């Protein structure tokens, strides 16, 4: 979900990559959101639910007959699954995205920002059994707001952090209060940090040698930090965690063995951690 602009990279942010097409995400822009229109072209205003069900069933039968002749077609299989999901979503999506059903106390807890609204919807989605929710943050419609390489990293990041703070805190408190936090892993981060050296003005260049991600709930330890950077804040030097280690740990917390979870693609079995990755057990409660 995006509170405003579509994240740069678009499908690369929520596509299925080499996983089956059914695992691709559904992009939702919640700015100026109307619960029955959060996903474009989801509703068919010309047919009743019963008529749509008949059409969907007929098309599914035709597609399955075609699939039998092909024996295997990942895109067609994904299309069959996606069509059924779309049918079900047009009746369930408006309900789960209608935050007006929340109490005034809950809405006040989260705040009025678009990002806070996204955090509240994320909680509602988790309650309804959605397995993965990705929420991106921008401000003033600027889709790469955190890219302050040439901007004011001090004032800019302070503004961005303030815009996120209440919604994030509310999400964690709300999940815990409803008994959902222990079974919901919350991960906050990006793909790199910011270097300690100047970019000419007040900006900072990309730094992938050492940066911070935080995790909450879902079986991780509370109230501690893991690892450390050098004296300049440039490179991780203590308890270093590679992105493959992080992914292996997340999968472990989800009950999946990253060494055994494979998908067949282009003639070979792929792992989400490639041939790398170790579970960081020190992070696990």
Enumerate the predicted regions with their spans.
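Ligand-binding pockets and gating/stacking loops
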Residues: 1-285
């Amino acid at each position: 979900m995006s509170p405003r602009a579509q994240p740069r990279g678009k499908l690369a942010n929520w596509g299925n990559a080499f996983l089956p097409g059914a695992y691709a995400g559904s992009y939702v822009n919640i700015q100026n959101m109307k619960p029955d229109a959060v996903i474009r072209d989801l509703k068919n205003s010309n047919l009743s639910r019963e008529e749509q069900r008949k059409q969907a069933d007929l098309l599914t039968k035709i597609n399955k007959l075609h699939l039998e002749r092909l024996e295997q077609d990942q895109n067609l299989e994904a299309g069959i699954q996606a069509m059924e999901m779309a049918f079900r979503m047009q009746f369930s999506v408006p309900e789960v995205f209608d935050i007006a059903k929340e109490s005034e106390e809950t809405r006040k807890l989260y705040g009025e920002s678009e990002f806070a609204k996204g955090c509240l919807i994320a909680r509602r989605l988790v309650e309804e059994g959605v397995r993965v929710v990705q929420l991106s943050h921008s401000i003033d419609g600027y889709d790469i707001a955190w890219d302050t390489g040439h901007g004011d990293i001090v004032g800019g990041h302070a503004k961005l952090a303030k815009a996120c703070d209440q919604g994030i805190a509310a999400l964690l408190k709300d999940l815990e209060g409803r008994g959902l936090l222990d079974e919901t892993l919350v991960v906050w981060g990006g793909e790199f940090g910011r270097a300690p050296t100047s970019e000419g003005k007040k900006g900072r260049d990309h730094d992938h040698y050492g940066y911070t991600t935080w995790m909450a709930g879902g079986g991780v330890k509370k109230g501690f930090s893991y690892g450390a950077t050098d004296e300049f804040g440039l490179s991780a030097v203590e308890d270093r965690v590679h992105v493959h280690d992080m992914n292996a740990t997340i999968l472990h917390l989800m009950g999946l063995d990253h060494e055994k979870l494979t998908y067949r693609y282009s003639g070979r079995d792929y792992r989400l951690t490639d041939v790398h990755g170790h579970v960081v057990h020190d992070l696990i409660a």
